[in-house]
A protein has these predicted regions:
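N-terminal secretory signal peptides
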Residues: 1-9, 17-26
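Solvent-exposed, polar/charged alpha-helical surfaces in well-ordered, non-transmembrane soluble domains
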Residues: 82, 86, 136, 153-157, ...
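Short, glycine-/small- and polar/acidic-enriched structural segments
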Residues: 34-165, 170-173, 189-195, 210, ...
Length: 340
């Protein structure tokens, strides 16, 4: 966000309705010359979170690609967007929230698909011994969160629902790893966090769930792409192939989660049983979906909510950042089939 390592005062640039009269959101796929489909010399630089895409693609048997993949581990959406903006990544992923700040900064990034993910692992936790039973009890308390991420958004909405705002709490912006350490030391009374760190806080330290992100988040997690890569015909073809493989991998994981959990555990060191517990309590199955009007409207609604909550100081129009040139990846023959 400034990405979240910088102060809000540096996020003042508004996204103008014109990210350009001609945007990638309205262009079709680049056209390959006849016979120019050899991808053997293409390298896709893909951002992965620990235990996610890299582990998923390998475990599902989708790793034999006609192009080379160079995995780069970056563990929040802000870092993915910063790397794409700096032309250090071709693909990444994250939530709709980093994407809002990218829009406001006119970052060189596009959103080309959405992953549907579990929202019950997006949690607002209280320490087991803290006098906190509901969100309203957070007033005056030390509450950790990760700026410009889903935790920033759903915590803002939960506070507003309880008649509070960030001004009513002692909000502490921490990375997930630093937040877990702070929770362990007793430096936080509550923590808004996502993923396996929330599970670790519950299992290791007896943290209690006050609320989840279900009902506050859309469940859409965009796939981020480098517009320079989208414009290159060979890279566009490789990205389209990767999206097909990724969708098959997610569908495979829905029916083979134990195998996926083992692959995740190898990277994260989170016990397989803990990952299975998260899965068993999921709000939805995995899926990868094409961009449609509902996706764009949902993202704009998040932007408008952030503006109303005072997190953004001006309107952001997100539609110009959504690219629909990969729609054929979701209609390709056999795309919905899981690998054997």
């Amino acid at each position: 966000m400034p990405f979240p390592t910088t102060s809000g005062t540096r996020r003042r640039t508004l996204l103008r309705a014109g990210l350009g009269a001609t945007t990638l959101a309205t262009l079709g796929a680049p056209v390959l010359a006849a016979g120019a489909t050899d991808l053997s010399k293409v390298t896709l630089r893909i951002g992965t979170y620990k235990g996610l895409w890299r582990a998923l693609i390998a475990a599902s048997g989708q790793g034999q690609t006609p192009y080379r993949i160079e995995w780069r581990e970056l563990n929040n959406g802000v870092l993915h967007i910063e790397a794409i903006n700096g032309d250090a990544l071709d693909l990444g992923s994250g939530s709709e929230i980093p994407a809002l700040f990218a829009a406001r900064q006119k970052a060189q990034v596009r959103f080309i698909a959405v992953v549907r993910e579990d929202l019950n692992n997006q949690v607002t936790l209280a320490r087991k011994d803290a006098p906190i039973q509901r969100i309203a009890d957070l007033k005056g308390k030390r509450v950790g969160y990760v700026r410009a991420t889903t935790s920033h958004y759903y915590l803002s909405r939960q506070l507003a629902e309880a008649g509070l705002s960030f001004a009513d709490i002692n909000a502490v912006n921490l990375t997930p790893a630093d937040g877990l350490s702070a929770f362990d030391r007793g430096d936080l009374d509550a923590w808004a966090i996502y993923g396996y760190n929330g599970q670790l806080a519950r299992l290791r330290y007896g943290a209690r769930v006050l609320k989840t992100g279900d009902g506050y988040l859309s469940g859409n997690f965009p796939v981020y792409a480098n517009p320079r890569s989208i414009q290159d015909p060979l890279r566009h073809t490789a990205i389209s192939d990767y999206l097909q493989r990724l969708r098959r991998a997610y569908l495979w994981a829905n029916g083979n989660y134990l195998a996926y959990a083992r692959a995740q555990s190898e990277e994260t060191r989170v016990p397989v049983g803990d990952l299975i517990e998260l899965w068993n309590n999921r709000s939805t199955d995995y899926d990868l979906r094409a961009v449609d009007e509902g996706v764009v409207r949902g993202h704009q609604a998040v932007a408008d909510s952030f503006l109303q909550l005072g997190v953004l100081d001006g309107p952001a129009q997100v539609a110009p950042l959504w690219d629909r040139s990969f729609g054929s990846a979701f209609t390709a023959k056999g795309n919905a089939q899981s690998p054997a």
